[in-house]
Structure formats: C-alpha cells, structure tokens
Amino acid sequence: MKVVSLFVDQKPEGEQSIDRAREFGFSVYPTIAEALRCGGDELAVDAVLSIGEHGDYPTNEKSQVLYPRYEFFKECVKVFEEDGRAVPIFNDKHLSYSFEKAKEMVDDGHRLGFGVLAGSSLPVTWRLPDVELPLECEIEEGLMIGVGGSDPMDYHAMEAMQCMIERRKGGETGVAAVQLIDGEEVWKAGEDGRWSLELLEAALSRSDTPCGLTDEDGRTQDMIGNGEIYRLVENPSAYFIEYNDGLRATLLMLNGAVRDYCFAAKLKDASVPVSTQFFLTPTPNVTYSACLIAKIEELFETGIAPYPAERTLLVSGTLESCLTSRLQGHIRLETPHLDVEYRAPAESQYARQ
C-alpha cells in the first residue's frame, strides 16, 4: 500500500510535505482534484485518506473548530461523479461539526457505492480488561468518563461510549433528546439519580491514572467515598443522551480526577456493572493509532468499512446538539433529526493482541 499523491491545505513554517514527498517518492498537488487524478485527466488512486485536523481554522460560537472535512470530502465526490468511478474514503475523527453536512457525506457513500469509514481510535484500541458486550444484550444504563477539552476530546469519549451501547438489543435507534450541564449541577444530578454513582464507581475502578492522593503517595482510594473527586474536578460536565428506544447514557468529562477514558454499563439481570478502560498507549509510540490504521487498510483493501460510518454520524450530531444545549443555557433539546438507525458489527473490531 503506497502513498502516491498528496494535497496539503495549509503550509505553516516547518511543514514537511515536500521533504516527505522527496523521501518517499510521491507528488504534492495544489488541489484535491489534481491529487486524486495524480496530475492526469481521470481518477488515478484506489482510496482516499482525508485528515482535517490541526492548522489555523476558525471556531464557531459552540467552540467547534471548523475543520474543512466536509469540503475535502465533497471535492473527492465531485471527482468521483465527473470520472464515473468511486473509491473508499477514510475521514479522520468526526465527519463534520454539522450533522447536516455529516449526513450528506454518509449519504454520498451510499449513493455512489463507495465505502466510508470515519472516527476515533478509541473504539479499536485495547480494552482493560478485555470486554466485549454481547451483541443484542439488554443495557439498562451506560456511563463514560472522558478527559480533555471540548471539542474534540468529548467527541472521542462519546464515540467510545457509542461503540459499546450500539450492541444493545434491537440495534441503534437514534437519539431522542440531549442536555449538557456544567459545574456543581453535575454532582447534584448524580445525587438525584439522573446518572448512576454506581456506574461512575465502576468506571473509575478501571482507571490507571487516578489523581489526588494516588499521585501524592501511591495509595489506592475510593474517590467518591472520600470526596476526593469533588475536590479534584473543578468544572465537571455531563452530557445526557436519551435514545429513541428509551436507553439513557451519560458522558462525564472529569478533568482532574483521572487521565484516561473508562466506561461502565448496567446490563439486565447482572448483579454488578460491566466496565473497562479504553487503553491509550503512551508517547512516543501511541500504538492505538496503529489499531485505527489497520482498520483503514482493511477499508482500502476490501472497499468495505469494518464498522458503519453511521456510528460517527450519530456521534457527530449528538455532540453538536449537546454543544447547542450548552449555548442555549443548558436546556434539554429534543433531537428528532438524529433518527440514525444501524446495526453494530458482529465483532467489535478492537485490538486483542
């Protein structure tokens, strides 16, 4: 598998595309169309890898960076339509800051018959412990812990949660409503039972990076019981997601409590929650990215996405609506447009070796 052409949208000081092209023998073109045609008159590549990240791009009122992922994608689609042939596209991370644009991207893949894959590396990295929810399991509630800023780290956490709960009985049905709250209201919502303290405890138990007392002297701790979590997390956020089939799930962004991403769920008739950590291997290796690259290679070789782009579509839209909730005063928003239905793959596709 070879890189044969490249388009670079921005070239700040230190940008290495020309050096890499010289080293590895590919060409850099001034437009996406020319890159896809390798300077010729028709589509001349077997697949497209689109990375809309980094760079100097504007931010909207929801604090979303307006990366041109949709625009890159549509430039590719234009070439496919003009040349009468389409090839698979991988789109790094969320499809777009806009659900409307993201849906058009997925629809283009179905319309023209090419594979579309997108998303985070978290769903395909290792899990500690190795947990795969049974397909068609009955989930009563789900909870995810994430860290980092919004947007994009809440996106990564939300997609990790989605890859677990999409395996529930009946498949994915879409999202009926969302609400995002911040600060002390998050803890009050937990006390009131809006999200499960039991699931938070189960998720925290999988973290390898508890902060506070563990950082200070290595002791183990019950962060909820001793109250340490309330001291450590200065500005928690809770993303409440209500699904069309009645399932409720919560993403808690808890900067200061832990440094990793952990999930817990209550399954019907189970006496204790199931929980796991989405393992992020340390720098400089960051081998969880290699797990995602393996799935990209599978898409490119077979033309078939190993898991549906509808997962990323739903997460893209859910996150957008959550950020709209925050912007509009943390109100609950009904989301009839997020009626995205799909089935999870039989195997979860995460790394096991």
Name the predicted role of every residue range.
Residues 65-73, 120, 153-154, 285-288:
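Phosphate/oxyanion-binding active-site loops and adjacent basic polyanion-contact surfaces
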Residues 143-147, 156-283, 290-310, 319-323, ...:
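Contiguous beta-strand/loop segments that form the cofactor/metal-binding neighborhood of enzyme cores
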Residues 74, 84-165:
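A contiguous active-site-proximal alpha/beta segment in oxidoreductase catalytic domains
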Residues 38, 56-59, 97-100, 125-127, ...:
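Short catalytic/ligand-binding loop motif for oxyanion handling, primarily in non-cytosolic enzymes
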Residues 1-88, 101-104, 110-112, 166-215, ...:
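N-terminal glycine-/serine-/threonine-rich beta1-alpha1-beta2 phosphate-ribose binding loop
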Residues 113, 329-330:
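Glycine-centered short loops/turns at secondary-structure junctions
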Residues 1-4, 9-12, 20-22, 32-34, ...:
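Viral RNA-dependent RNA polymerase
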